[in-house]
Amino acid sequence: MATFLSRAKRLSLSAGFLLAVGVAVAPQAMAQTITVNNNLVFGDVFPGIPKTIDKANAGTAAEFQVSGTAGNEISIDFTLPTYMNRSGYNMQLIFRETDCAMDSSATPDQSNPNYDDIDPWHTITYALGLNGVTIWLGGIVVPRLNQMNGAYTASIVLTVAYTGN
């Protein structure tokens, strides 16, 4: 069991994460809100068998909704962990250069987003749509053959800020 934190709101999720969200607001722009619509859920994992959650998998990939002033440009930064921890035991996490996707259309489509294969390790710059932007994140957990069982946690920090453009 793990936890996401979104603007002082904690949400539960399986095998995973603590999400801290930072928001910077330009004076002329409406404040962003960040909502966690779905948690990144690895579910059961087995020793020595990596498990991948694709960003397009509804119900298991993390889904975030960012709203704010339509047309304003924002920067999105993830601070991603490389391990989850449980009482001194670690389990490797991998976030690939294609593990993020976004869609700012009126009806965001996780299976066919308008901005796909995004690198979550680098700053993402994007203009908010009328409905904001929906962001999806997948990843891989890599348990060792002798991995201790139990609930592992890690922290993901998502920072969204207006760029002024």
Regions inferred by a protein language model and the residue ranges of each:
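N-terminal secretory signal peptides that target proteins for export/translocation
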Residues: 1-8
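N-terminal small/polar-rich segments of proteins
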Residues: 29-91, 127-165
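Mid-chain, structured segments of secreted extracytoplasmic proteins
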Residues: 72-124
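Bacterial N-terminal signal peptides
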Residues: 12-26
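A detector of low-complexity, intrinsically disordered, Ser/Thr/Gly/Pro/Ala-rich segments
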Residues: 1, 31-33, 121-123
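Compositionally biased, low-complexity segments
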Residues: 8-10, 96
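Serine/threonine-rich, low-complexity intrinsically disordered segments
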Residues: 5, 125-127
